[in-house]
């Protein structure tokens, strides 16, 4: 399993609510269109300030952590080739320009290691 992680920042002037609304009602569907048949999971995780008392939401370097899981390198390569096609790029870039600060986009593939944790008792 290969995971692609992308850190994305909303375009200046776009509120957090507007950003999430557009991503979840429009941009997500573009992603699903080009990832279908290649990816096994596609998630968006919207960042919030963990210590709101000492940090303003505007201090976050990114607004969303996007994760895409592929069953292997061939599936990821095929998806990336499709996404790189001229017709896909026209659609994707046009929407990204409405939504993201494109200069700040960062993508990484990651190796995951998971720890099994003991069960937490209810009410803890």
What are these regions (language model features)?
Residues 1-124:
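Macromolecular interaction modules
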């Amino acid at each position: 399993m290969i995971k692609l992680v992308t850190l994305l920042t909303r375009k200046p002037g776009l509120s957090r609510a507007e950003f999430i609304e557009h991503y979840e009602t429009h941009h997500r569907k573009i992603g699903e269109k080009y990832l279908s048949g290649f990816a096994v999971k596609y998630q968006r995780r919207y960042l919030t300030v963990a210590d709101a008392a000492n940090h303003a939401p505007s201090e976050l370097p990114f607004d969303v952590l996007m994760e895409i899981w592929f069953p292997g390198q061939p599936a990821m390569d095929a998806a990336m080739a499709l996404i790189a096609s001229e017709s896909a790029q026209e659609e994707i870039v046009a929407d990204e320009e409405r939504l993201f600060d494109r200069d700040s986009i960062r993508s990484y593939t990651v190796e995951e290691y998971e720890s099994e944790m003991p069960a937490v008792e209810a009410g803890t």
